[in-house]
From Swiss-Prot:
Superkingdom of origin organism: Bacteria
Record protein name field: Homoserine O-succinyltransferase
Record key words, sorted: Acyltransferase, Amino-acid biosynthesis, Cytoplasm, Methionine biosynthesis, Transferase
Species this protein is from: Shewanella oneidensis (strain ATCC 700550 / JCM 31522 / CIP 106686 / LMG 19005 / NCIMB 14063 / MR-1)
Principal EC category: transferase
Annotated residues for binding of substrate: K163, S192, R249
Transmembrane intervals: none
Molecular function GO terms recorded: homoserine O-acetyltransferase activity; homoserine O-succinyltransferase activity
GO cellular component: cytoplasm
Active site: C142, H235, E237
EC identifiers of the protein: 2.3.1.46
Entry-linked NCBIfam families: metA
Site positions (Important for acyl-CoA specificity): G111
Length: 313
């Protein structure tokens, strides 16, 4: 959250140059405060586990967040009871008339399937298109990040020969972005995917900005220049055991998976896993929710044209 300071205080310029969020008394006096309304499109097989992971991160912010859970209405969930889905999830027809401050679209176990061949691809496209007019900011995770870059910006992904699984070191490629406030120069994040985006295509796209990358895992954080879409190529929401669970699941299915890199102590799958990314995941979601949702969204959600442009802040 910002530090409120007197108008024209000399320290303001110094703090802003250090990427510290300060707010003048004049602007603070004109701020309206209400709960943030966030919609989560949960495409992961284990709905309850993913709900818990995302709500854990949203609940670690200073803001009050009201959450709605969204499903693809004609897609049966094989790993979550129909009672749970009917009780807690909404269909798109229930929300298409609404506006939201934020939308999170999760990953999905569809890494080797062409987007156009995904059975519910038309529904995904419809929701993404809807979000550009009805949501202040959209957070795309892993598979959804690739899908969003493909649908909105025409970028194609490359299928990897083997699944990329592990915890990798990343670095910021920019310094003075609100999303990166408080980030270390290098930080860890987990990945679990069968595809990657071309870093140079992202760099050269006029509507996109590459904010963080990894020598081993490639592009990680990509932000649209209108600040509306944030693409996260990894899984900062994962809990400590998730990569281990996926590894043993794939072993049980005789898929001959590689051991997740930099995850187990001494890279020994019989040893304990080491969670190195939780503080990063918490900071990433907190910064997104604060700087790209709360600071930009209109008080009256019925008027999405009243969004505050970044340039005026």
């Amino acid at each position: 959250m910002p530090v409120k300071i007197p108008d024209h205080l000399p320290a303001a310029g110094i703090l802003e140059s250090e990427n510290i969020f300060v707010m003048s008394e004049t602007r603070a006096a004109n701020q309206d405060i209400r709960p943030m309304k966030v919609l989560i499109l949960n495409l992961m097989p284990n709905k309850i586990e993913t709900e818990t992971q995302l709500l854990r991160l949203l609940g670690n912010t200073p803001l009050q967040v009201d959450v709605d859970l969204l499903r693809i209405h004609d897609k049966e969930s094989k790993h979550t009871s129909i009672d749970h889905m009917n009780t807690f999830y909404r269909d798109f027809e229930d929300v298409r008339h609404k506006n939201y401050d934020g939308l999170i679209i999760t990953g999905a176990p569809l890494g080797q399937i062409d987007f156009e061949d995904v059975t519910y691809w038309d529904h995904i496209r419809e929701i993404i298109d809807w979000s550009q007019q009805h949501v202040t900011s959209v957070l795309f995770l892993c598979w959804a990040a690739h899908a969003g870059l493909y649908h909105l910006y025409g970028l194609n992904r490359k299928i990897l020969e083997q699944k990329r699984s592990g915890v990798f070191v990343h670095r910021r490629t920019c310094q003075h972005f609100p999303l990166l406030r408080g980030f270390d120069d290098e930080f860890f994040a987990p990945h679990s995917r069968f595809a990657e985006m071309d870093v140079e295509e992202i760099r050269q796209h006029p509507q996109l900005q590459l904010l963080a990358e990894s020598d081993e895992a490639g592009a990680y954080l990509v932000l649209s220049r209108n600040n509306r879409n944030l693409f996260v190529m990894g899984h900062p929401e994962y809990q400590k055991s998730t990569l281990n669970d996926e590894y043993h699941r794939d072993l049980a299915q005789s898929l001959n998976p590689n051991v997740p890199q930099n995850y187990y102590r001494n890279d020994d799958p019989k040893a304990d896993a080491i969670a190195r990314w939780h503080s990063h995941g918490s900071l990433l979601v907190s910064n997104w929710l604060n700087y790209y949702v709360y600071q930009l969204t209109p008080y009256d959600l019925s008027d999405m044209t009243a969004m505050t442009p970044w340039e005026s802040q």
